[in-house]
């Protein structure tokens, strides 16, 4: 009968986390904690490493669908759901941290931030950012998610959140899943409608941004509509 002993430098991930702090753990160890168990064919550490080997970077995990996660060796439906929930929670925490009282100094700065959030979305998302008198973001609201042809903005809904959060200005942002950021006639129409509605309420439409993974279009920079 053999007894198994662990050396100080080979503590199980949960024990290492408790002893040394979460920052001390490798990506493999963190993922192993989330996966919890292995299979008959592979240990949880082997599965974690296989998952990481399938990624070009950790950000790929955020982009993966439930089906894509399940296609990875050793990842069943339950593990895939749990992983996606954890990834989304981490994303929301990060978004909240960067959102809190962030001052908007330029369209380029804001576009870069929203590219990270919307650039890889496969459906069109229309988002409104609401600002105070110091041009600090006080609220972010997704107005619409859908196909390009169905993405019709309703000024009344956009202004509802502006009034609710006592915003003095707002920025519209939406993505083009195709990757091309040139505005459509519908984009121009929506921009005009929202600007007119904002003016009636004494709210400033600072910009309307169109973003893709690698590019952006600013109505304020490129047109005279704003």
Swiss-Prot record:
Null mutant phenotype: Mutants show normal uptake and processing of transforming DNA. They also display normal sensitivity to DNA-damaging agents.
Signal peptide: none
Keyword field: Hydrolase, Metal-binding, Metalloprotease, Protease, Zinc
Gene Ontology MF, one: metal ion binding
Domain MPN: residue ranges: 103-225
Pfam family, one: RadC
Keyword Hydrolase carried by entry: yes
Chain sites annotated for binding Zn(2+): 174, 176, 187
Gene3D superfamilies found in the cross-reference section: Cytidine Deaminase, domain 2
Motif (JAMM motif): 174-187
GO BP terms, alphabetized: proteolysis
Family note: Belongs to the UPF0758 family.
Name under which the protein is recorded: UPF0758 protein spr0996
């Amino acid at each position: 009968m053999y007894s198994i002993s662990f050396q100080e430098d080979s503590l199980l991930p949960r024990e290492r986390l408790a002893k040394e702090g979460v920052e001390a753990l490798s990506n493999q160890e963190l993922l192993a904690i989330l996966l919890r168990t292995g299979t008959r064919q592979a240990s949880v550490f082997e599965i974690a490493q296989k998952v990481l080997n399938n990624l070009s970077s950790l950000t790929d995990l955020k982009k993966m669908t439930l089906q894509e996660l399940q296609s990875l060796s050793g990842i069943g439906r339950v593990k895939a759901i749990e992983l996606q929930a954890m990834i989304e929670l981490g994303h929301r925490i990060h978004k909240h941290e960067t959102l809190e009282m962030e001052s908007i100094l330029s369209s380029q700065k804001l576009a870069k931030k929203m590219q990270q959030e919307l650039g890889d979305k496969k459906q069109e998302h229309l988002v409104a950012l609401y600002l105070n008198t110091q041009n600090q973001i006080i609220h972010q609201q997704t107005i619409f998610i859908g196909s390009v042809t169905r993405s019709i903005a309703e000024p009344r809904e956009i202004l509802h959140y502006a009034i609710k959060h006592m915003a003095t200005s707002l920025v519209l942002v939406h993505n083009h899943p195709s990757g091309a950021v040139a505005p459509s006639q519908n984009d121009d129409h929506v921009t005009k409608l929202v600007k007119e509605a904002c003016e009636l309420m004494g709210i400033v439409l600072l910009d309307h941004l169109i973003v893709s993974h690698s590019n952006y279009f600013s109505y304020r920079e490129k047109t005279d509509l704003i």
